[in-house]
């Protein structure tokens, strides 16, 4: 689907952005999140310059994204290690099973 113009309110300003209809709800939630972040920053830092608040918020979001990427990378590495260990355990069990079935006297008559 093609993007449609959508008006969103951020920090008292109306912005018109193009957005596919199926993503409008996510856009509105993102706008609400940004609005809340800016309000919290304004109170916490006592900065009144909107541009400065936007830059600080952007830096915070980038930092959070970097932290999440790191956690995802660590999680993936951990899962890969667990999968390798599981594969080794299965292979070892199959080798042991092969040894047991190859022993003389283990055949049914």
UniProtKB/Swiss-Prot annotation:
It holds the Pfam family ZapA. SUPFAM superfamilies: Cell division protein ZapA-like. The lineage of its organism: Bacteria, Pseudomonadati, Pseudomonadota, Gammaproteobacteria, Enterobacterales. GO terms for biological process: division septum assembly; FtsZ-dependent cytokinesis; septin ring assembly. The gene is zapA. Residues 21-97 form a coiled coil. It comes from Sodalis glossinidius (strain morsitans). Keywords: Cell cycle, Cell division, Coiled coil, Cytoplasm, Septation. GO terms for cellular component: cell division site; cell septum; cytosol; plasma membrane. This is Cell division protein ZapA.
């Amino acid at each position: 689907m093609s993007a449609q113009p959508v008006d969103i309110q951020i920090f008292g300003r109306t912005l018109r952005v193009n957005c596919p209809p199926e993503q409008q709800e996510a856009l509105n939630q993102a706008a609400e999140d940004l609005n809340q972040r800016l309000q919290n920053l304004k109170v916490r830092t006592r900065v009144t310059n909107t541009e400065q608040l936007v830059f600080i918020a952007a830096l915070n979001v980038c930092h959070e994204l970097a932290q999440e990427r790191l956690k995802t990378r660590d999680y993936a590495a951990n899962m890969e290690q667990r999968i390798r260990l599981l594969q080794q355990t299965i292979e070892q069990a199959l080798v042991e099973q092969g040894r047991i079935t190859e022993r003389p006297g283990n055949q049914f008559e």
